[in-house]
Amino acid sequence: MRSAKLVLAFIMALVGYTSYSQEAIIYGNAPDYKGDEIVFYYYSDFITSTETEVGRCNVDEKGTFNARIKILETTYVFGYLGIYKIYFFAEPNKKYQLLLPPKEDKTEAQRLNPFFRETETQVGILNVDKSDINFLINSFDLKFNENFDQIVMDAYKGKKSLNIDSLVNSIENQYKNTNNQYFNDYRNYRYGLLKQVTFYKKSTSISN
């Protein structure tokens, strides 16, 4: 997730924050978590990974939960649920019906292990539509990641002809009518990251 955090930091620098607070509403039903408190955060500083709370809620005896998330703009929001680190992208003035993963608490060994890292999971959203930022990013990542590893491997092997431009054009044709600036910045940064990585790998292979 480190690269994703860099993507998000870059986008935040481009877009900037407004001076007033807005809200997104999250809600759902998760009987597995009844009686638990769920806290949501965002990274107020991506370089130092500073986590700042943006909202919290209690899951009642019926498994129902809801919370107001304080955000300024499209924001990467996350929370810790046992072995999972769930995340999604929240936009102001929207409502998200979350589908939480089955509850799985950390074992004692995991809890005491300073190197244990939660499994990062993009949380399900039951009321998502195809124009939502979560749907767009997820669909893009699936297409992009299908080719990312192979292109990087080809670059490391010193292959002269790489399919970066054709990959970018192929993906962009599917999103050419998308108006979401956050999503546009996200895609462009991922493309730039791919080009940097392949350039580095090719340089390394040549020097060796």
Predicted regions and their residues:
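Bacterial Sec-dependent N-terminal signal peptides
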Residues: M1-G28
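A non-transmembrane, solvent-exposed segment enriched in polar/low-complexity residues
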Residues: Q22-Y182, Y186-Y189, L193-S207
